Amino acid sequence: MSQSIPFRQAAFIIVILAVVQFIIQVSLLTKGMEYAAVSLIIDDTYYYLQTAWNAKLLGFVTFDGLHATNGVQLLWFVIIFLLAKLAKTKAILLFTTLAVSFLLNGLCYLFILRIAAVLKQPILALFMASLWTLQSLPFRIYSMGMENSLHALVFWCVIWQSTVFLIRVQNRDKPNFWGLTVVLILNAWTRLDSALLSTVLFTFCVGMLAYTYRHNLRLFFQSHSKAITGSSFLAGFGLIAQLTAFRLMGDSLLPVSALIKTSDAVQGSNIESIDKLVEILILGMPSILHGRFPTPILVLLGISGILLVILAGVSIRDHSDEIRAFLNLWSCLLLGEAIYHVYVALSGVEYSPYFIWYRSPSFIFWIITGSLIALFTFEHIKLVMHSINFHKWAPVGCSLIIFAVAIYVFARSINFTSKLYAARYDAALWIAENSPPDTVFASWNAGQLGFFSNRTFINLDGLINNVDYYERVLKGSVPLADYLVENKVDYIVDYSIYHSIPDYPVVRTFPLNDETGRSIHIWQVSSQLSSAP
């Protein structure tokens, strides 16, 4: 495939996209704390912020200041803990975390450029960069301070290292096992469930290497057994280090959040599994499509996109060696996505409430898919149109149009306000002003309340509590009312009750002022209503 624009020109445009996006997202911080609290940050973000802050002050990993916890993703928590060590106030920690997230979004363009440089495809770089802008700029998933931005950066790096590895294999050069292994370890450290994708990618890369020696496997083992063994030991060390860190933080090898999210995993019916598979497929597609098309259309779009890439890969004979290697990697990503989706669908894990925010690998897969389709379409048009200006400016124009759409969607969503978050923010400030410092609260959604109230808030959904609570209350027979009395809880604060509790009196209400008619209630806990003697 011939190139139509110099790589330097494409790189300049992509750097502009990255800088403009970073400036736009950082400008959100000028709107102040209340805007960040009610328009950007989800409740789970405060689980990281409050836990890192308490770890700094108390010397152990705890959200509520009472119970040790490991309900975090390792790499993002380490980063926020380091930020907490540097921050003088919780407000500075919050804004710094958001700024780091925005910086990570921008750094993704660096690895997009590295991928395109290896592939010698500046046009592909333009398409991938503009589609990444459309995903990461207008939608809150990459401006909420969670590990999504870090995961995206790490996964783009995984794509880069995997591409380099496969191209070197294809050229019969010595592949870099160590670079690939390190980024795959970081991928698992960023999201524990991404260990599955890391395993699939490493196995695929080794398999492709072995395939080149298919006529002399003995030479394959002689040449690469030490590197494969060393990489496997390094990966094992990375896993042991991760599990050891979780064990030291909170008395279990797996994070308590992972135990809870998978505790109800059971074999569902075939119909339920198919419905869930469709749900997961759609949730992993680009956010710009969500809510704009009915489910059958989205499924058809996804299947059609995959088939188009497969058809182009098979039918177009003049692919460069680099693009062929990239298509092999795309096939591996497709396999990894399929395995992950089928596992979640068949296991019965509740995907929507727990995993809905953590879809960076899926987003990146679809960005690559769309970019390959755009590249192949452009190359086909070039065969029938011989205008030099078209060859040079059409990809640039397309990428800038996509960028303009991203800014337009961002501008329309900038004034979004969650009435739930606003009411919870007001409740937290009221608690800070109207309760003694030693008051103990509890909530199923404790993040925002605990962070802004500066009071002890025990997490009742268990995701950022300790393993003892999971084993005794959530999975065991200890009534929640007894646990509340045992931990000297004075009040429960939430907009909904997720476990059976006695008829505690409501002492304060904060209406959400939405169509649901819900309110955040403050219940006063009474020891007389527990079953404890």
What are these regions (language model features)?
Residues V15, V19, Y109-L113, V206-N216, ...:
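Hydrophobic, aromatic-rich transmembrane alpha-helices
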